[in-house]
UniProtKB/Swiss-Prot annotation:
Belongs to the dethiobiotin synthetase family. The lineage of its organism: Bacteria, Pseudomonadati, Pseudomonadota, Alphaproteobacteria, Hyphomicrobiales. The keyword ATP-binding applies. One of its GO terms (molecular function) is dethiobiotin synthase activity. Pathway: Cofactor biosynthesis; biotin biosynthesis; biotin from 7,8-diaminononanoate: step 1/2. Gene3D superfamilies: P-loop containing nucleotide triphosphate hydrolases (3.40.50.300). Its EC number is 6.3.3.3. InterPro entries: DTB_synth_BioD, P-loop_NTPase. CDD domains: DTBS. This is ATP-dependent dethiobiotin synthetase BioD. It comes from Bradyrhizobium diazoefficiens (strain JCM 10833 / BCRC 13528 / IAM 13628 / NBRC 14792 / USDA 110). The gene is bioD.
Amino acid sequence: MNKRIVVTGTDTGVGKTVFSAGLAGLLGANYWKPVQAGLEQEIDSECIRRLGGLSSDRIVPELYRLRTPASPHHSAEIDGVRIDTETLGLPDSGERRLVIEGAGGLMVPLTARTLYIDIFERWQLPVVLCARTGLGTINHSLLSIEALRKRQIRILGIAFIGERNAETESAVCEIGRVRWLGRLPWLVPLTNDRLQAAFKDSFVSSDFLNL
């Protein structure tokens, strides 16, 4: 039985990491971000530990930790690092489920020749697409859905993040023919307790278990 889920987004800054923290907490899953670009501030795995309540042994180490906060291919070039995409194999998470977070959107380049979506196509894992609820998200979401379908990557569903926008959410799901998984509101302040409570109110765990 597959126990791995990929979390990707329509863009950078849509809330993938916060969603991943909530999902890992809800499922009792491990977390892995294959490539981390930017090390000066709180990195994504640290954010996951704080917001998801994960112990350090539930964080799978990154394969690449790049200093510069930029697209991985550019960050690697600046740091003098060569990303070998052949090493991006799936780790063993034991009996636990595994939440895998990409970087930015689907077309983010890892190298000059390899995009994140190329890796997702190779893995053939179910994908949760995170999207904004604001203006422009219909276009971004439908383009992302089309790209995933073209590669025959299974879309588990779409998770919206932001203020409620029923018309937009409905349009994306109906036109894109994808399942609405729920909507996570922006939380201020954003804490572990508030995120876990909001996640349980916004999503149904069984939607992420039958993979």
